Amino acid sequence: MDRHHATYKKRLAAASKQEPADILVINGKLIDVYTLTIYEASIAITDGYIVGIGDYTEGKTVIDAQGKYVCPPLIDGHVHIESAMVRPEDFAGVLVPKGVLTAIADPHELANVAGVEAVTYMVEAAKDLPLDIKMAVPSSVPAASFEENGASLSAEDVRLLFANEGVYGLGEVMDYPAVLNGDDDMLEKIAMAKAKGRPIDGHAAGLNSDALNAYRTAGIHNDHEAVTAEEAKARVQRGFYVLMREGTAARDIEALLPAVTAANARRFAFATDDKHLDDLLKEGSVDFNVRKAIALGMDPLQAIQIGTLNAAECFQLDDKGAIAPGKEASFLFVSDLSTFQVDAVYAKGMLVAEKGELTSPIRTPYPVPERLLNSVHLAPFAREDLTLKLKNAHSTPVIETTLGSIVTKKAMASVPAENGIFQPGGKWLKLAVVERHEATGHIGLAIVKGFPFSEGAIAATVAHDSHNLIAVGADDESLYHAIHHVAGLGGGMAVVKGNNVLAAMPLKLGGLMSTDSAETVKQQLNELQQSLVHLGYQEKIDPFLTLAFLALPVIPALKLTSKGLFDVNAFAFVEQ
């Protein structure tokens, strides 16, 4: 008899009550996400799997739920760990106490810096953690063919990465023009995922009905870019799962909930996409999505189903998503469903977090490759290189941004200028994107409205998805010094006023992530936020994440790259 058969015989013996279970959970109120009901039952667990629910009475170890709700652990359907600015090990330490035990992660941020080496690092760093990180192979590196990033991933690279047992699916297909135009390299990546039966993640920002039809025909089966109820309905009608996103900059749940009905609710799941560490610590991960949906009027059982079973089925996670025989013995204890505060977290029958804290430390972090610690390479440039000369200052394209949104508007406006040279100040600030991977010296400049700074500048090497150095400022001196300081850090973020650095945070790992602990990163983020008041910034929303998306030329409408101002809807560069 092989070991596999012996394991199943042991589980079957416990399931049929011929032998005691390894673990017995008693006095719990089970949340049944299949029927959206609650009932009292014991849970029998053997070898880390649930073997029965009902009137079981024998277990070698007994866990008393003390009348609390027993809930399946949550699943984040789409996340970029890099946006939390900590390593996978530290990320797990933050999410597990929140009741999130599975995350579908796409490391395309770091892949845009260092390609295959970056993905391999993320896969290895994600192993043997209490958080089950399902790592996807990035499909669109770069996000658009004209981008200046640090690496690319070809179909052959994707093939090699799929051979790694730590790789789960194909990451979000951001380059939708490549799909719609039948690009051979992109179609080969999709075909590989299909052949392996792996999930294929979508990114259908702004696509009309015809484009959605083609996108779904290609085999892409979920999307997290719906921002209105109408967009969500259009996706569900075509067979997509809609991942309702609530991150730091993109907060879409309130707009999307009206699309959820009793008839279609099984086609919705939750995601965070991009969420800063301070927001994860303060609000939570997809546990916050659940709480927000409940606060907005959704039935708690429905919200829990969306955050568990729906996500598990969307991503073909057959052993997750419910408290039922054959599933992993992972579960949460929750006292009050209306507030959904997680009291305790069990992973495969083991207590891993209680009262918001881990019960044991996360293992030592995986070593970071040297290339990822040396990723910022700027060509020499002078302050004069930040001069923006306009063809017509009385009617020039301007990026209109709204804090809390990653979608911008294209506007034609009259802006302050002297001899045709833009003069930043007031509501009109200067945006700069400086190429930082190959020291090409390319600098994109634009005018942006919507950042409430009266002086100074902020800069960062977090600029989706090519992650060049991006900065916005009210004057060229501050802008110049902010860019140089961040480059000198080897990547990171800075708040600058004139030539004075008010606060800074190094992000040495690819210019995106810190090698410090989550607690240290939290403190540095707090210092950055506090320093913003000296620029006249009074808003609660973190401007750095809003800034980071101003360089992403696959989300409407007007964005800036190192090569210039780009109209996403027209998919073309525009003159200023």
UniProtKB/Swiss-Prot annotation:
GO terms for biological process: adenine catabolic process. It is an enzyme of class 3 (hydrolase). Belongs to the metallo-dependent hydrolases superfamily. Adenine deaminase family. This is Adenine deaminase 1. Its cofactor is Mn(2+). One of its GO terms (molecular function) is adenine deaminase activity. InterPro entries: Adenine_deam, Adenine_deam_C, Amidohydro-rel, Metal-dep_hydrolase_composite, Metal_Hydrolase. Pfam families: Adenine_deam_C (PF13382), Amidohydro_1 (PF01979). The keyword Hydrolase applies. NCBIfam families: ade. It comes from the Bacteria. It catalyses: adenine + H2O + H(+) = hypoxanthine + NH4(+). CDD domains: AdeC. The gene is ade1.
